[in-house]
C-alpha cells in the first residue's frame, strides 16, 4: 500500500513537472521491489506488484503503445520465472497437465462435497489435509463448510467493492487520488481473483491470500493499510493534493 502510493506520487510529479528525476525514482522503486521479491523468491507477489506499477504508468501516461510494451515485458518476466525457478515451473506444468495437483484436487473435492449449503461450521475436512489451508485454500474451506451460495456471496463482495470505488472516483477531480485509489483497489480485487481462481483450478496456485479472510498478521496489516488509505481518499475529496492538480 505505502509503496504503491509512493510510486504513484512520483509518477504524478513526473507528469506535472516533466522532470526526469522523478522518473528515476519510479524506476528505482520498481527495481528495489523486484529485487527483494526475486531474492525470496515470491514470483506471485512480484507479478502482482509489477502489474499494479504498470497499471499506474498506463493510467498516468495514457499511451496505448505503452500498454503493449509493458504487456510484452510482463510475459517475458513470466517466461524468465518459468525457466529459472523450479517451483514456478512445477506449478505451471501441473496446471496444464491432464491431472490437477493433489492440493487442488482436494480443494475441488471439498467444494463439491460442500454442496449448496455446506457441511456445517467446523465439520469440513479440507483444513486437515492441506498445509497452509487457512491461507491458500481458505475459499474452498468456506464453501465446504458454508456452501456454494456463501462462496458466491464472498466472491461477489470484491466486484461490488470495485464498483463502489469507481462511483467514488467519479466525483474525485485529483489525478493522483484517482489513479492511486484505482490501483489499490486493483491489488485487492486481483489478489482475490487469484486466490479464488487457484482454489477452483482456473489458474495455477500462487500462495496468495484472500484479502480480509485468510489468516495472517502481515497480510491482514497490509490490507488494513490499503483499506484505510481508500477510506481516507473517499472522505477527503478536496485535500491538499487538489491544490497541485
Where are these regions (language model features)?
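Membrane-interface transmembrane helices that cradle and orient dolichyl/undecaprenyl
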Residues: 7-21
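Hydrophobic, glycine- and aromatic-enriched re-entrant/interface helices and adjoining loop segments
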Residues: 66-152, 176
